[in-house]
């Protein structure tokens, strides 16, 4: 691991810091021309998809050691929070005036961050932190008043969104890489074996149904216009009420 002083890995002479010039890039959708480049600064490796918050005025991205908010028009870094971790994969989610993030390896932690800060807001805008039930791969899911996470041990956790307190846990069968999704009042959890669990959200584990595609599924399912889109290792499935008839 390249060394920048924030990792516990030993330094090695001559190793470069590949994220030194890392940016958040905004492109014109029609022409592909660069609109702006927002500097990430001391933020190590991350694999997250950025999200829009604050009525679309900010882009929030999480990387190793940092969660950051950028002005969507100018690329200016508006705020930053220290969040130790390497190889961050879960994308941030937003709900109830909070941004929920999971850090990567080294110090796994789920954090809730209040909107509206400027500068380094590590000491002022973290609403709560939880070191149990931290998702390492699948993104969190917010369904008021709860936040749901799936750990590397394939355990589904339900937490109070306002406090981070764990409401219930349930060990899932199989391995889970895909993020859970919410649609039409139900939570859908897809395993690598191609099994989708349909859950009723709430203060207890409530499984309604289970469906098996019988194929390997690593990607998260997408939901659009009343249909589900699932990419397996072999096929792309479109599932809706119309196709079920």
Which functions belong to the PLM regions below?
Residues 2-6, 64, 104-106, 115, ...:
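Short loop/turn segments immediately following the C-termini of beta-strands
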Residues 18-32, 112-115:
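Beta-propeller blade signature
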